[in-house]
């Protein structure tokens, strides 16, 4: 079967975004399908209601009032980062991600929504997901443009931090009803689908969990550092980080700190700029991992590391749903950071964890096998 995949793909430094796309394509190809990534623009066609716009403005004003120190600190840090790193670093990261795309993904040209409506790529089925594609309200990712006789499947689609509203549900309801099968990444997504009139949505694992550690080791770089180290990976979403505590822990354990930051995370600390292959290797060979990233947590689990996942704060706090959906069923809820860094030392029965992850992965695979 010829399958077109639609998900986010333009990233310059979001490792999880590109790896979930890679995993979806790789798994479907392992079933014998011919797959390709449909590259698209992100034109929006949803206008929030006056009430939603007012609520958004009030939330923004409140955050500025409640956390002025945070916005001031980040503005200063951003300026210092750009002055000291400049475009050279960013260009290098862009180049490495583009090389990964060219080497590992089969891609179409870039389509606009209008072009997709008039002349879509030929396919027997389209699969949308994963990532927060349904947090955008783009008709593109709801396959509003796809013809009726083409199979439409959503795999582990995420609404991100979006809350249900009548306007939003009315918009997406006719689009969701056209899908042959719908699955979401978070339990909260099932509720939102029900509110939009789709009561049969299932919760499945992120596509990165359709592959195992050995699959990723095949594309990962060899070990980069001889010394023992702890790996830190933070995204720019607001997170309460006690850096003094982190450095004290590393000193006590005689560990180096390797710190990769992406998606707008800026601060005064030294960063390591890693390719996707290097990023995988850095997690795989670390003594400990600390992250506020969902995908950072996924790969930490796959590689069997001691870890802490930092919850995000403020308006983005709803994004923690994906972390709890991932960790709580595995009995790893205590590894969500609560101020005690020594929780890094909690023993983890990875034989049991990997068995449970394999069962959840099997459910995701069965969903795809059944509906494609």
Sequence positions of predicted segments:
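Active-site anion-handling motifs in enzyme catalytic cores
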Residues: 1-372
